[in-house]
């Protein structure tokens, strides 16, 4: 009887203790490190008096349904519009994305935007825009993404406050307001789980990895680079 109880205790204890050690303890540790990091950054953060010119590169491929929201989010950001230049690089798209671009030119005249056509794939399209850019910093943004209003200011401020940083990636989240449009059920639950997955990956996982200087990949949907560093690299690999 004692042996059965002991075996049961070890079995169920393993199911409780192992996840606690492997998941909960590191999670608590990461929360502590992130709080400490945020406090440290706030204490040493110096607000910018002059905003450097930045270049946003938006690859476009049949993006008519999302492109307007993407460009509007840039226009509505707190970064000065006259310090932003946008390259929209069309990669053999067949829809009316250009019409959306033309509409945005009319509605957001303060934004300097340029449409470029590339017939040789996304990587060559990105390299083409890089070579034609003038900004001190290069930011890649997917055409189905929408910026949080302070995202650009926060990112460039961090760059300017730490010259050792040559690249960084932003947090990618789905939009909670859009999830609420779905009725309760499997479809909405799936999107809620997706939001939690993104939140865990970016707000906790990558932030913790950043604190340990161990981020090994950047999100293609929203990443930024110091142009002087990028031009010393091999640029985007055109074989992929």
Features from the language model and the residues they span:
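Long helical/loop segments within the catalytic core of UDP-sugar-dependent glycosyltransferases
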Residues: 108, 124-125, 156-239
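Cell-envelope/extracellular polymer assembly enzymes that use nucleotide-activated donors
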Residues: 52-55, 85
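Short, acidic, metal-binding catalytic loop of nucleotide-sugar glycosyltransferases
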Residues: 72-83
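Acidic helix N-cap motif at the loop->helix transition within catalytic regions
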Residues: 68, 95-103, 150
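Short aromatic/hydrophobic "clamp" motif used to bind/position activated sugar donors
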Residues: 138
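N-terminal membrane-anchoring/stem segments of glycan-assembly enzymes
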Residues: 1-50
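Acidic donor-binding/catalytic loop of UDP-sugar-dependent glycosyltransferases
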Residues: 96, 145-158
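A conserved acidic beta->alpha catalytic loop
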Residues: 90-99, 118-120
């Amino acid at each position: 009887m004692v042996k059965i109880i002991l075996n049961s205790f070890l079995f169920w204890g393993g199911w409780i203790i192992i996840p606690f050690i492997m998941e909960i303890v590191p999670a608590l540790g990461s929360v502590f490190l992130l709080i400490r990091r945020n406090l440290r950054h706030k204490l040493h953060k110096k607000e910018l008096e002059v905003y450097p010119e930045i270049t946003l590169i938006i690859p476009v491929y049949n993006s008519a349904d999302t492109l307007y929201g993407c460009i509007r989010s840039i226009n509505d950001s707190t970064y000065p519009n006259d310090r932003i230049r946008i390259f929209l690089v069309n990669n053999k798209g067949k829809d009316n994305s250009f019409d959306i671009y033309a509409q945005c030119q009319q509605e957001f005249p303060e934004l300097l935007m340029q449409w470029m056509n590339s017939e040789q794939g996304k990587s060559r399209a990105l390299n083409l825009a890089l070579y034609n850019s003038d900004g001190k910093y290069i930011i890649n943004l997917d055409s189905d993404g929408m910026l949080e209003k302070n995202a650009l200011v926060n990112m460039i401020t961090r760059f300017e406050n730490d010259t050792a940083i040559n690249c960084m990636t932003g947090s990618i989240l789905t939009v909670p307001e859009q999830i609420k449009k779905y009725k309760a059920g499997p479809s909405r639950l799936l999107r809620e789980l997706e939001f939690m997955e993104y939140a865990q990956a970016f707000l906790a996982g990558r932030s913790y990895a950043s604190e340990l200087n161990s981020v090994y990949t950047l999100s293609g949907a929203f990443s930024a680079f110091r142009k002087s560093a990028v031009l010393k690299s091999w640029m985007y690999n055109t074989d992929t």
